[in-house]
């Protein structure tokens, strides 16, 4: 499965049978698509954006309009936005929009774009995050008001599901795109999530251990489960094992096999988005 920089070679005859999941950041649009009818239809690609942090909307518009594939009449479109301007607050607090907005402003001083409140199932928490100015209206116009979530939500919900029947203290580390997404669970309950930019394996180890120590997990008895980029995992795991006894791979969602063998090669968060109805 090649990760191409465009969508020219993708030929879909019946888009009304297909589901599209997009993860959008300042550098690229990563996406998966699969058919509810065709076997082994799953595909994963990335399309680079010609722009940067200070000019995000126009490159995104160009990317979508330059790739007619994105404008097909899909059965379903879902979007995850990468945003580092976010807070995580209790679900009941997030249910009050005014209160959620005040909490965000307390953290960041002002709202510079569109604020989105993303309730996470099974976590007892919500991510309140900012979409860059103009991005949310563009997505709503182009994809007919798709669900737009934070890039951390899918993995938080998935790992929360894995912990719900336990009283485990556990850390999950998901490696992708030079990032480490770290989630923490205490007594089987969601406690913390953050996304860290990592320029080296040492960065990943530092952020993982910092969260581990902050939440006082036991290095001899508690688990650290790791997912994501294979090469990054192979470099990081031996380093983590110097400090934590139980470092093991996170369980891959078995349901992903139903949408195609290539699903195993796609990023975990996009797979999880693809599996959710």
Residue ranges and their predicted role:
Residues 1-277:
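Hydrophobic/aromatic-enriched cytosolic interaction surfaces used to assemble or bind macromolecules
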């Amino acid at each position: 499965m090649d990760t191409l920089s465009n969508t020219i070679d993708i030929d879909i005859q019946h888009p009304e049978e297909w589901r599209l999941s997009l993860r959008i950041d300042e550098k690229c649009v990563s996406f998966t698509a699969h058919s509810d009818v065709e076997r082994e239809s799953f595909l994963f690609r990335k399309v680079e954006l010609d722009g940067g942090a200070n000019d995000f909307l126009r490159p995104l518009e160009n990317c979508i309009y330059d790739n007619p594939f994105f404008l097909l009449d899909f059965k379903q479109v879902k979007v995850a936005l990468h945003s580092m301007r976010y807070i995580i607050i209790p679900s009941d607090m997030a249910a009050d929009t005014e209160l959620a907005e005040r909490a965000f402003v307390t953290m960041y001083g002002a709202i510079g774009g569109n604020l989105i409140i993303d309730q996470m199932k099974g976590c007892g928490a919500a991510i309140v995050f900012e979409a860059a100015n103009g991005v949310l209206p563009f997505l709503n116009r182009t994809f007919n008001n798709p669900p737009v979530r934070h890039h951390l939500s899918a993995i938080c919900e998935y790992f929360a599901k894995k912990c719900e029947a336990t009283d485990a203290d556990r850390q999950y580390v998901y490696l992708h795109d030079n990032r480490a997404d770290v989630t923490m669970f205490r007594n089987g309950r969601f406690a913390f999530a953050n996304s860290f930019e990592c320029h080296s394996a040492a960065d990943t180890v530092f952020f993982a251990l910092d969260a581990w120590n902050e939440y006082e997990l036991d290095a001899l008895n508690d688990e650290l489960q790791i997912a994501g980029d294979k090469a990054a995992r192979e470099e990081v795991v031996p380093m983590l094992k110097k400090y934590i006894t139980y470092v093991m791979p996170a369980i891959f969602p078995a349901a992903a096999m139903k949408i195609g063998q290539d699903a195993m090669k796609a990023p975990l968060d996009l797979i999880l988005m693809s599996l959710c109805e």
